[in-house]
Amino acid sequence: FLAKKVAKKLVSHVAQKQLE
């Protein structure tokens, strides 16, 4: 199932947005 991969990408994306 891809949920874990997608979740990781989403977390990475959100984390980068919050860092800016």
Curated annotation (Swiss-Prot):
Q: Which GO terms describe its biological process?
A: defense response to bacterium
Which InterPro entries does this entry report, sorted A to Z?
Cupiennin
Tissue-level expression reads: Expressed by the venom gland.
Look up the record and report any one GO term of the cellular component aspect.
extracellular region
Q: Name one Pfam family in it.
A: Cu
Record keywords: Secreted included? yes
Where Glutamic acid 1-amide occurs along the chain? E20
**Which domain of life does this protein belong to?**
Eukaryota
Entry GO MF terms: toxin activity
**Subcellular localization(s) per the UniProt record:** Secreted
Look up the coiled coil feature and give its residue ranges: none
Please provide the record's keywords in A-Z order: Amidation, Secreted, Toxin
Report whether Cell wall biogenesis/degradation shows up as a keyword of the record: no
> What family is this?
Belongs to the cationic peptide 04 (cupiennin) family. 04 subfamily.
**Protein's name in the database:** Short cationic peptide-4b
What species does this protein belong to?
A: Cupiennius salei (American wandering spider)
Taxonomy of origin reads: Eukaryota, Metazoa, Ecdysozoa, Arthropoda, Chelicerata
